[in-house]
């Protein structure tokens, strides 16, 4: 009899849970419609892969690209809608979150054609690669709209797990395995530190998990200036610093960049930065509203360290991917300026604008590296010597992207940095902006050093890799060149049309 009653209670509880989940999905599902499109694409990929004996590779790429493009279209149609909180407070939909989701989707869309030729030439498993990319993109999108501590922790873990699997995708490569192990161990440690900070925030606010409710809870408990909040701030800053590759939590970045497949590095170099920037902006601006002076100081120190260490160590690198790893550490230091400035002096708008330009500059550079690596099998900077004599298009494309990363006018990187530094100067961050300007000059040095190698015509400096270089061993008009052309055009002319980009970015403010 007791067993019968317990069984009935279990059925009733299960029914209530199912009905509540169905109700949430029915009435709140439209708020995560872009994410639902990606989930549908993932399911479709899995079904085709598991049921079809003869796998049509082009179909996999078509499904992945189409789901990403459709998600972008839905986001654009949803632009300027009223901010909404859905799924019992787990997600918040507004223009600010959606612009970061757009940047993540754009990065993933450009990375897929960049990886097609590489995967085919290296005979990697295609379906799993696309599944991991889409799942990581999904995790990044959920992170951008997350509104409570649990979702904010789970979403980046979804992204991180896929990142670990992607970085170790070439299982027979010893460097890749070593990089993945370092990435996994340090990623696990940083996640533990982050969730420990969340626990202090949760306790200090009286058991609240929603971001805005945490602020109200801190006011009610009078704990907003307590030591517990300072401890939470330190732990959360360390955890986010790892996600952003901020010094001194940057040691994993060069090894992962060097050991991972180049398309994976291209994907991680932009999507992880965008998602972590969205996380940092929301966490610091809302729950730590009363500790703004403290987190401003912390981020200033980390930004200065990142800009100095990243750019100075990049000078000494001989591997192109390691050089870009240290360069990205310096680049994220510039982005931190926008986070510190906030929405009062256009800081968020300048950060979003620069992130958009950074995506095109960085992916354009990696597209050139993928193309060169497939034709020569090398990543050494010295082996690029004389590339202009064999492939002027590739050499010029790489040169333009590197110059844009350095911030030389009239390229997009110059206008992006100009707007970012100007907003920082207006906010009174004179020392931070001065360091940024100085390190930008330093970065131009090592970018120009590579460009000088590209353009050299002296036979004694040209390595056998370039001397035996074939113009088109891959298919003509391949997908890598498509990504390369799009990114190079965006890196060169998008800075000229900055006004509409800035206006759109300013509309995303809270």
Swiss-Prot record:
Entry-linked InterPro entries: NADH-Q_OxRdtase_suN/2, ND/Mrp_TM, Ndh2_N
Keywords: Chloroplast, Membrane, NAD, NADP, Plastid, Plastoquinone, Quinone, Thylakoid, Translocase, Transmembrane, Transmembrane helix, Transport
Annotated localization: Plastid, Chloroplast thylakoid membrane
Recorded superkingdom: Eukaryota
Disulphides: none
Main location: plastid
Transmembrane residue ranges: 24-44, 57-77, 99-119, 124-144, 149-169, 183-203, 227-247, 295-315, 323-343, 354-374, 395-415, 418-438, 482-502
Keyword Nucleotide-binding: no
A GO biological process held by the record: ATP synthesis coupled electron transport
Family named by the database record: Belongs to the complex I subunit 2 family.
PANTHER family assigned: NADH DEHYDROGENASE
Name this polypeptide is given: NAD(P)H-quinone oxidoreductase subunit 2 A, chloroplastic
Source organism (scientific name): Lotus japonicus
């Amino acid at each position: 009899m007791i067993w019968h009653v317990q069984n009935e209670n279990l059925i009733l509880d299960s029914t209530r849970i199912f009905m509540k989940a169905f109700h949430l999905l029915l009435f709140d599902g439209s708020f995560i419609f872009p994410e639902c499109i990606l989930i549908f694409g993932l399911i479709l990929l899995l079904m085709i892969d598991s049921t079809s004996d003869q796998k049509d590779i082009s179909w996999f790429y078509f499904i992945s690209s189409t789901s990403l493009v459709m998600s972008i279209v839905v986001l654009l149609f949803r632009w300027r809608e009223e901010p909404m909180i859905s799924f019992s407070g787990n997600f918040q939909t507004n223009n600010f979150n959606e612009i970061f989701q757009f940047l993540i989707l754009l990065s993933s869309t450009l990375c897929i054609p960049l990886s097609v030729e590489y995967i085919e030439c290296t005979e990697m498993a295609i379906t799993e690669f696309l599944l991991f990319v889409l799942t990581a993109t999904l995790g990044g999108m959920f992170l951008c709209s997350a509104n409570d501590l649990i979702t904010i922790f789970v979403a980046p873990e979804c992204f991180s797990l896929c990142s670990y699997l992607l970085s170790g995708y070439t299982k027979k490569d010893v460097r890749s395995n070593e990089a993945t192990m370092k990435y996994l161990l340090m990623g696990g440690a940083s996640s533990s530190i982050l969730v420990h900070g969340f626990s202090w925030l949760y306790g200090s606010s009286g058991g609240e998990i929603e971001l805005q409710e945490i602020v109200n809870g801190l006011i009610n408990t009078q704990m907003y200036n307590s030591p517990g909040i300072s401890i939470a701030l330190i732990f959360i800053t360390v955890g986010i610093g790892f996600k952003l590759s901020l010094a001194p939590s940057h040691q994993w970045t060069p090894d992962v960049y060097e050991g991972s497949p180049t398309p994976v590095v291209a994907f991680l170099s932009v999507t992880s930065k965008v998602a972590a920037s969205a996380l940092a902006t929301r966490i610091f601006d809302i729950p730590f509203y009363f500790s703004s002076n403290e987190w401003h100081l912390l981020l200033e120190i980390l930004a200065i360290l990142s800009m100095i260490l990243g750019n100075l160590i990049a000078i000494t690198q001989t591997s192109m991917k390691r050089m870009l790893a240290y360069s990205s550490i310096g680049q994220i230091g510039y982005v931190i300026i926008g986070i510190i400035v906030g929405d009062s002096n256009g800081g968020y708008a300048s950060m979003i604008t620069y992130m958009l330009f950074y995506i095109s500059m960085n992916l354009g550079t990696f597209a050139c590296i993928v193309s060169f690596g497939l034709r020569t099998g090398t990543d050494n900077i010295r082996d690029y010597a004389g590339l202009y004599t064999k492939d002027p298009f590739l050499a010029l494309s790489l040169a333009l992207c590197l110059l844009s990363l350095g911030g030389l006018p009239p390229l997009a990187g110059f206008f992006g940095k100009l707007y970012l530094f100007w907003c920082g100067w207006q906010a009174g961050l004179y020392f931070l902006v001065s360091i940024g300007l100085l390190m930008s000059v330093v970065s131009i040095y090592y970018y120009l050093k590579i460009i000088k190698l590209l353009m050299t015509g002296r036979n004694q400096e040209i390595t056998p890799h370039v001397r035996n270089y074939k113009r088109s061993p891959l298919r003509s008009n391949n997908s890598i060149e498509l990504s390369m052309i799009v990114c190079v055009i965006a890196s060169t002319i998008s800075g000229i049309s900055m006004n509409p980009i800035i206006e759109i970015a300013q509309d995303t403010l809270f």
